[in-house]
Design a protein with these regions (language model features):
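Gly/Pro-biased beta-strand-loop elements
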Residues: 164-273
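Short, flexible surface segments
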Residues: 136, 223-224, 307-308
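Exported/periplasmic cell-wall-interacting domains
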Residues: 26-34, 38-40, 45-46, 51-53, ...
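Solvent-exposed, polar/charged alpha-helical surfaces in well-ordered, non-transmembrane soluble domains
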Residues: 135-138, 188, 296-303
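SH3/SH3-like (including bacterial SH3b) beta-barrel domains
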Residues: 124-134, 202
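SH3/SH3-like beta-barrel superfamily modules
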Residues: 14, 20-93, 131-166
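Short, structured beta-strand/loop micro-motifs enriched in basic residues and often containing a Trp
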Residues: 115-126, 288-295
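Short beta-strand/loop turn elements enriched in aromatics
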Residues: 93-117, 268, 272-283
Length: 316
């Protein structure tokens, strides 16, 4: 085009030389190299392992896709943020344009994301009525600040949205994600990895886990998505279903979305002593939304994974 407009090829070369640095080349899933150097080595699963009359596995192709994504989104300097509305602490999200009542008799958007604990996402052309809900804990790229709204791009669902300021926690400029936890709903397993170089990742643990099950009105599935580790509790107290009475506690709990935690084997009242392992781990979904682990593995994650700097991928 420049040549056609009468600018010489030499001038173009000069222009090309002085333009800002070229965009870094995207890393493909095929380029990702994974080695194993376990920091936690109890109940370790093989890459493929027997389960009842079938086999289960760690889905390396999907894991590599997500690791490549995590590297690629960080190639250009970005301000990162987290969508936050745990227990509606930042205010109940307004009603979306089109909504329904789900199996739990709660309001949800047309994609099934519940209003409770979620964040309203507004189209860039309409800040009066939200279009859909964003899940608590979701990783977003922070694009622009405003008086009442900020512009963000959630990494999992994509596109650009306006969100009222109070629902977005902005992370420090220095934030860099090199630790990640992969939770597999299909095969009921969990893996921790950390980055050791460009396109190079090291597995730190690979273990059985149990995710949330769809069982209204109390138990629900662990949400799929890309989340940031938000907080930790040495003991997460839980209530008996449908009651305000304490049901017990889950040890070494690391929260990533809504009331979803990665935690150890639950301890029911009146017992107080920790339970290390349960034979149900790695079998079928059975928790309320949380990701249940051997208690020593949940403690490993609790100690190893920094808050606001660890990415949790929930995949299927």
């Amino acid at each position: 085009k420049l040549v056609m407009e009468g600018i010489s090829a030499n001038s173009t070369a000069f222009l090309e030389e002085t333009t800002p640095e070229e965009k870094p080349k995207a890393i493909s899933a095929e380029q990702i190299e994974i080695k194993k150097d376990l920091l936690y080595d109890k109940y370790t699963l093989e890459d493929t392992y027997p389960y009842k009359d079938t086999t289960r596995s760690f889905q390396w192709d999907k894991i590599k896709e997500r690791l490549a994504l995590l590297e690629n989104i960080q190639q250009t300097p970005s301000q990162w943020g987290i969508l936050q509305n745990y227990k509606n602490r930042n205010g109940e999200a307004p009603l979306v344009r089109h909504y329904k009542r789900n199996a739990y008799k709660r309001i949800a958007d047309t994609l099934g994301i519940e209003r409770y604990q979620s964040v309203p996402l507004y189209l860039l052309t309409d800040t009066l009525v939200p279009e859909r809900y964003g899940e608590d804990g979701s990783l977003v790229r922070f694009l622009a600040d405003g008086e009442n709204f900020v512009k963000v791009s959630p990494i999992y669902i994509g596109e650009e949205w306006y969100v009222p300021k109070r629902y977005v926690k902005v992370l420090p400029d220095t934030t860099h994600f090199i630790k990640t936890i992969m939770i597999d709903r299909r095969d009921q397993n969990i893996m921790t990895l950390e980055q050791t170089g460009e396109a190079q990742w090291t597995v730190r643990s690979m273990n059985p886990a149990t995710t949330g099950r769809h069982r209204p009105p109390y138990a629900q599935e662990t949400p799929l998505g890309i989340f940031v580790l938000q907080e930790k509790k040495t003991r997460m107290i839980f209530l008996k279903d449908g009651s305000t009475a304490t049901g017990g506690f889950a040890p070494y709990a690391s929260r990533f979305s809504d009331g979803g935690y990665i935690h150890g084997v639950p301890v029911n009242e009146p017992r107080k002593a920790l339970i290390e392992y349960s034979p149900s781990l790695g079998t079928t979904p059975r928790s309320h939304m949380c990701v249940r682990n051997a208690t020593s593995h949940s403690k490993f994650i609790f100690d190893w994974a920094p808050v606001n700097e660890t990415i949790i991928f929930v995949l299927e």
